[in-house]
Amino acid sequence: MEFSGRKWRKLRLAGDQRNASYPHCLQFYLQPPSENISLIEFENLAIDRVKLLKSVENLGVSYVKGTEQYQSKLESELRKLKFSYRENLEDEYEPRRRDHISHFILRLAYCQSEELRRWFIQQEMDLLRFRFSILPKDKIQDFLKDSQLQFEAISDEEKTLREQEIVASSPSLSGLKLGFESIYKIPFADALDLFRGRKVYLEDGFAYVPLKDIVAIILNEFRAKLSKALALTARSLPAVQSDERLQPLLNHLSHSYTGQDYSTQGNVGKISLDQIDLLSTKSFPPCMRQLHKALRENHHLRHGGRMQYGLFLKGIGLTLEQALQFWKQEFIKGKMDPDKFDKGYSYNIRHSFGKEGKRTDYTPFSCLKIILSNPPSQGDYHGCPFRHSDPELLKQKLQSYKISPGGISQILDLVKGTHYQVACQKYFEMIHNVDDCGFSLNHPNQFFCESQRILNGGKDIKKEPIQPETPQPKPSVQKTKDASSALASLNSSLEMDMEGLEDYFSEDS
């Protein structure tokens, strides 16, 4: 991989050449990109792809895949993030280019562990399934050929000749349906799953597969190719990570939160200390609700709890003076000497507001940060209840929150499937009595803001939109350099030679 200071350029192609580069709205990503892009575009494409795949995950849990609602919402996300989704749309080159490059960027970030690879493959498969489902029938054969799949649609004459055998082997087909259904001739080895289920007609080493069943075979091929490609990329990853300009981004990308950071406090001072107890039961997510309850009962929280809860309170509008008063009043109830609080704990509170030390204005923790870092130990109350609680204790907690038995079962099923944020979103919908909250939950402060918007009839203070957040804290003093600050500090004229990436995606590396 090479970087240079040459003037940034993109591959410029004439109309026909551009279309030839990306003939379809979906692909198997067989060839890595070979153009130069700026590091800023590299970062932006990566962030947008993460947003897209997380939307794919959330929608796949919230809706039945393939339903009209699922299709409509996923298409909306693709449109919003400017990725390709349909054939025959005008000026599709740029969305398809973004799709191609961003996929390979995320391979670098998500090849680093088995868990990351598994998640990445599943979301990419679901995305491919959606795109294939809306691919016009007259484009399918070309797509299969471009994807190097030896699947060929048989002629009407062949279909008529084998009609009886095909219908007998495919329970959902009738003679009438067969007339409108494309049948594909596929090598037997590629249709083993259908053969095991006795759902396919075999003849001379070939399987005759209806279009409705070919999707599973295509997805299996895609999974196998992508899994192998990620393993090859992982072998070459040390060479990529040796570049100090890419290493921070790749290390943080798979675990980064890309939404609003809730550090811009348009509602500073709008929350009074007297309101917190009531707000904790009405508008706090379970992670903050349990921290508030523990603080009121024990008059103390350990460092992890103070950081998680303190920054959340800061994000919903508590001023520095209010925060000092809130924590001091509570800790003194626990028999702490006021002087000890002033000399020790008050410094940490001022520090979190950017008034001490390196003057870092810390941002509230996102769901991903809470889920993935600093798990609670005995005596701790921080963390995510859906991720870190014993299922039976979580069930009891939900019962105390007056969640219905059916609702508790839904939430526990989501937790069992490791969909912790979706479980919290389901909790939000239940306590606010809404069927669809209309957003993907990614942040405790988002939970609070959306709750207040519902309870106040949409009249709560809306925060100004800000740039995507990178791992906390905001400035580049955290650990080494966070992903955004590392890239932002580079001269924007630097470019990345995408041709160099080929070494990391091929078997010869």
UniProtKB/Swiss-Prot annotation:
One Pfam family from the record: DNA_primase_lrg
Keywords (A to Z) from UniProt: 4Fe-4S, DNA replication, DNA-binding, Iron, Iron-sulfur, Metal-binding, Phosphoprotein, Primosome
MF GO annotations: 4 iron, 4 sulfur cluster binding; DNA binding; DNA/RNA hybrid binding; metal ion binding
Listed SUPFAM superfamilies: PriB N-terminal domain-like
Region named RNA:DNA duplex-binding: 300-442
GO cellular component: alpha DNA polymerase:primase complex; nucleoplasm
Modified residues (Phosphothreonine): 470
GO terms classed as biological process: DNA replication initiation; DNA replication, synthesis of primer
Effect listed in the UniProt record for changing residue 108 to A: Decreases primase affinity for POLA1 by 40-fold
Cofactor entry: [4Fe-4S] cluster
Subunit (UniProt): Heterodimer of a catalytic subunit PRIM1 and a regulatory subunit PRIM2, also known as the DNA primase complex. Interacts via (C-terminus) with PRIM1. Component of the alpha DNA polymerase complex (also known as the alpha DNA polymerase-primase complex) consisting of four subunits: the catalytic subunit POLA1, the regulatory subunit POLA2, and the primase complex subunits PRIM1 and PRIM2 respectively. Within the complex, POLA1 directly interacts with PRIM2.
Domain remark from Swiss-Prot or TrEMBL: The RNA:DNA duplex-binding domain interacts with the template phosphates at positions -2, -1, 1, and 2 positioning its bases -1, 1, and 2 for duplex formation. Interacts only with the beta- and gamma-phosphates of triphosphate moiety of initiating NTP of the primer. The side chain of His-303 mimics a RNA base that would be paired with the template nucleotide at position -1 via a hydrogen bond, thereby facilitating the stacking of the initiating NTP.
UniProt family annotation: Belongs to the eukaryotic-type primase large subunit family.
Protein name per the record: DNA primase large subunit
Species, as recorded: Homo sapiens
